[in-house]
Amino acid sequence: MNCRSEILEVSVEGRQVEEAMLAVLHTILLHRSTGKFHYKKEGTYSIGTVGTQDIDCDFIEFTYVRVSSEELDRALHKAVSEFKDALRNSGSDGIGQVSLEFYQKKKSRWPFSDECIPWEVWTIKVNVVSLANEQERQICREKVGEKLGEKIINIVEVMNRHEYLPKMPTQSEVDNVFDTSLKDVQPYLYKISYQITDSLGTSVTTTMRRLIKDTLAL
């Protein structure tokens, strides 16, 4: 099985990191979640509905849609908060990346543990910019909102390609494909990891600073 890989880059002010990451991760998981499966007998099941809600950002001029699941939201908040803290405490140039990996389990014979086979990985590269004053912050609030909107459109376009997804499992195999631990939604199995880098992400950071400078010059 070939694992698809998608890379997104965002350039944000420090206080925008959490909202930007949540917007991207929630958008991806909105398209990679189903309602809960209700099995009647082996091979026959119904799928519950997935509720959605609009989320308005505080530090970005942007509204995104997420799955209406408090459990999923808490899990993503926890992962993003850990990344944000690591980024802040790293002493680096404010460069890092978060990976959202979807995988399925392949049962192994005892005494070996199950094999986790990734089928799609999203990498979000984050560049944190420093701004001089409130005027620049207000411009950044709008510009990041515009750029984030473009990223969301990119995500939706990828989702609409109808490429490989794990086939719908039987009842005995559902835990090999979906995370069934949540009571109100059933995302494909996923894991989130992050890393902080020391190299300066000059291309995206410089682009954002140029956008702000050009706007100030108008």
From Swiss-Prot:
GO terms for cellular component: Atg1/ULK1 kinase complex; phagophore assembly site. Keywords: Autophagy, Cytoplasm. One of its GO terms (biological process) is autophagosome assembly. PANTHER family: AUTOPHAGY-RELATED PROTEIN 101. InterPro entries: ATG101. Its main location: cytoplasm. One of its GO terms (molecular function) is protein kinase binding. It comes from Xenopus laevis (African clawed frog). Autophagy factor required for autophagosome formation. This is Autophagy-related protein 101. Belongs to the ATG101 family. It is found in: Cytoplasm; Preautophagosomal structure.
